[in-house]
Amino acid sequence: TIVTDAPLEFAPQDNLRKAPSDALYPLFMRLEFTKLIDKYGLKPPTDVPAAEEPVDLTVTAEAVTTAEKAEEFLALFRKAEHVTLLALPDLSGVIVDCDTSENAAVSAEFYFNRYESDWNALLRALFSDDIKKVSHNVKDLQRTLLENGLPIEGFVFDVALAGYLLDATAGKYDIASLFAAYFHQTLAEPKHLEPEAFSMLGDTVEAETAFHVYTSAVGALYETFAPELEKRELHELYYKVELPLCAVLARMEHAGM
């Protein structure tokens, strides 16, 4: 016999399925559950304190198409303490962000199919030692430069390498993953890396926007990682061993070793 009147403290409303809370946002970001964040419409909780007060910064983007204008920017880059540089995998496009004052910066974009002068001469200047560059995945970029007979000098920081030293268990060190882990924000899709992004078949505006966003993200990661390396006393390991090793490995890979 089934007893149907057994005492049981239960209210159906207590078992209602509740919508995920925004409190899950940091956890989902750390676990890279970006699709679940989008599915549930989660947003960063408002009670999470910002790492620092936002700074007003005016950034002027400019497409550089002539050798004369390029030389103006190269002179600016050479005077800077450092610039943030991001290149397309095939070197057909480069964006360089450079601070011009405490609250102003310029973002110069260079594209092979729009540049009216010697593209390789421009690349030789950009990747020479007199321009101090912050970038991402420096070893791979240096190998590509060597394959094209270009210099590999002047790299002073690699955010992917720094991300690895700061957390060797993260597993992913692409720009979007690093940005999500440290800033709890999801970057837009890297449209600039799609095969036809800058062709007539692609959405050039979306690709250019993404290219600028990811370059800015590299700069933001540098501002976070550089002091963190100092705090953890990793300065010597990073600047004296790991970063110089990038060029050594790039040359070995280029030589087929």
Describe the role of every protein-language-model region.
Residues V3, F28, E52, V83, ...:
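N-terminal functional modules and adjacent low-complexity/disordered segments of proteins
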Residues E62-L229:
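Conserved DEDDh/DEDDy metal-dependent 3′-5′ exonuclease domain
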Residues T1-A19, L27, D47-V48, L178, ...:
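Mixed-charge, glycine-rich, non-catalytic linkers/tails in nucleic-acid processing enzymes
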Residues S21, R30-I37, L42-T46, Y115-N120, ...:
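Short, structured coil/loop segments at alpha-helix boundaries
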